[in-house]
Amino acid sequence: MKKTNNILLLAAIAAAGFAFTSCEDQPDKFENTSGIPSVNYIRSLSGETQNRNDEEDRKYTYGELVEQASPQEVLCLVGNNLKSVYKAFFNDCEVTLNTSYMEDKTLILTVPEQIPTRVTDKLYLVTKSNDTVKYDFHIIIPAPTINNMSCEYAERGSVASISGKYLINDPSFPLAVKFTDKNGNQVNADIKKIAEDYTSVDFVIPENAAEGSIAISSIYGETKASFNYMDSRGMLFDFDGKTGLGNHGWHSRTIKSDETSLCGNFLQLGENGATLSEDAGWDDANFSFEYWAGSWDTPQNITSGDGIALFNLADFKDSQNKALKFEMYIPSSNPWQAGAMQICFQPLEQVTISGNAIEGYDNVAAANMYVFNGEGTGGDWAKGNWGRGMYRPWTDTGKFDTGDKWITVTIPLTSLIYDRTGAVTSNTPSKETDFASFTMFVMGGGITGTECSPIIKVDNIRVVPIK
């Protein structure tokens, strides 16, 4: 930007700062003024905005003049008599005005997230006496945003849903959900329903859909999902022989198939009426699945076969942009009402199957549950101060089931930040070698619920990119 514009920017920010201070100190003093407002120009207070007349790679910085913006961008109107504004609209979407950010010559507002039903490319400023001032301004509707899919392993021919934003169906350009067939070609799903607020779409998965990418296209562009349909990348436990891994700890958790199976065998936590107390007290015999790396050899084998260290099986590089995912089924007859599903990765220094030596490692721990019971003496981790995920969806309503269907659960690896009591800890897995062993244990977590006998079926435990 030119130097003169930088000076104007500083002036606008100073005026806005005065508005913040004066109005916040005396919030009850604000009164709309009389007269008609006017807008000289609009500045963006968000990071990246583009003028419609500029090159595609032009990126605006904080405070530059703009003629268009996207939903939820923050703008500063610069003009005169802006305290007379009683209501404001972009197209037919009303803006929520904060009087703390209104001054005579500046008005700071956020573009509504709502999608307009009538597009006029105008900003409307309305006074208390219903005088209306129009200002040319274009709202850029983004391409679809894809957040998640109800079940990434849903059967072909079944109905699934994707949640996101801007899932807009235009008569001239219908919304399309695209899967990939075995030849790498895109195949369209049959769309059944689109939410009125454009945040979800229900569809039938094509019969010829294969493992691969999913994309959604609208009149505003196309977006590829970060996840794949039937994603086998980073697979740790599929319980059908793909990785060959399963129980490898103190307990032989039930691995089976039945009429509810999603794709063959699954792991089951809780059965035969096993009860979780209100505080989900210790019951590893029924609610713990352990996979502890290593073997009974000396030195231990961590590079292949049953006992392979998980970091030698899947890619844990760039873990801040990855997540643990799995499919889960909780029948409505046995809802989950207590305890946290503690999801814990550990390095070889904390646990292995035998405790025998491992080439290249000075410190190797034997089998133990110190990270959960806190009864060890080998450091903070052995007292339970080691980061793990705490998945507890029942806390929203007091109980949780999946409605007798499979869903996909996503646990970002950046959320492995809780100690055994549910308190946040900075002692968390970060290096690739921190992801050698894995335990999934429903117990404790520092919350109290209702005594229950949940059945939790789990399949396709994997580590995949989410960004």
Residue ranges of each PLM-predicted region?
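Beta-strand acidic-aromatic groove motif in beta-rich domains, primarily in extracellular
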Residues: 334-358
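Extra-cytoplasmic beta-strand recognition segments
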Residues: 239-241, 312-341, 411, 461
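Extracellular beta-strand ligand-recognition surfaces/modules
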Residues: 325-326, 342-347, 368-372, 378-391, ...
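Secreted extracellular polysaccharide-interacting domains
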Residues: 275-321, 350, 365-397
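Beta-strand/beta-sandwich contexts
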Residues: 24-83, 130-173, 211, 220-244
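Extracellular beta-strand elements of beta-rich domains used
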Residues: 456-463
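C-terminal motif of bacterial Sec signal peptides marking the signal peptidase cleavage site
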Residues: 18-22
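Short, aromatic- and glycine-rich surface loops/edge beta-strands on solvent-exposed regions
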Residues: 117-129, 209-220, 439-443
